[in-house]
Amino acid sequence: MKLPKTLLFGFFFGIIFSSAAQEIIVHDPVVAKQDGTYYLFNTGHGISVHSSTDLENWKQEEPVFSEKPEWTDEVVADFKNHIWAPDIFEKDETYYLYYSVSSFAKNTSAIGVATNSTLNPNDPHYNWQDHGIVVQSVPNRDMWNAIDPNMIEGEDGTVWMAFGSFWDGLKLVKMDDDLTKIAEPEVWHTIARRERSFKLPDTDPGDAALEAPFLFKKNGYYYQFLSWDLCCRGDQSTYKVVVGRSKDVTGPYVDKEGKPLNEGGGTLLIEGNENWYGAGHNSTYTFDGKDYIFFHAYDANDKGAPKLKIAELKWDEEQWPSLKEGVLK
């Protein structure tokens, strides 16, 4: 769930880029690179945007939406244009920006999508065209939450959307050819879940705390990074990042010990220490031959301000990821 969070950041190994990058205030960062410039999109009013040529020095750009998309009030009454957890995806020279509209701690939610031919706001062709709802969840109807989208293209060219938060786990759904709707007939898979107490009402997010799947192709596998446990609880936060993998985009995903993510499996990648109130909602990319993980972490020494973190991934002999040497202090 993507409102301001006081998360707990992990004791982990990583190269963290310059202080300029660390000082950027973000939630749920995703990134695309076009013509030598990195464009970062994150949770914020109208979807916040930053640009950089070096992953260190960032320029704030105008938000994607100066006014809320027209359809949002149909999902969330009196929606304030605070849009959560975007994902940016490029195919056939078109950029697709998926985003989340929701009420905190409810599955009154929908994922929308907008398209653009360029990410450069100075390009005369720069214009975000909104296409409305891709998928919507409704309380007492659905046991899943339509937020936290992530797009992945399979080996056969089929595009899938992973998404979800709490309830009965994280989902993967096949997209139609224009990537603005779910394919018909619908094809759904559950790609991660944790045990949920049967005593809770269906409208309750539940105690199976997981969200924000991000799928990444590497080494002949699809890796699923996801966030576990609780944010938003100050120094009691337990938010962390775990990972699993599969040979098939639809799963089953398993952790390093072979436990399925659908049965609560997950290999720990990032967890907290006394200096950071959590890390989560990561994205993972290959830029210029190097693999990077982007995420936000809350600074215990700066009143819990959420900071952008970027680390380089490394891979062991069994092709499992960890973060590069060095400990975040």
Q: Where do the model's predicted regions map?
A:
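Bacterial Sec-dependent N-terminal signal peptides
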Residues: M1-Q22
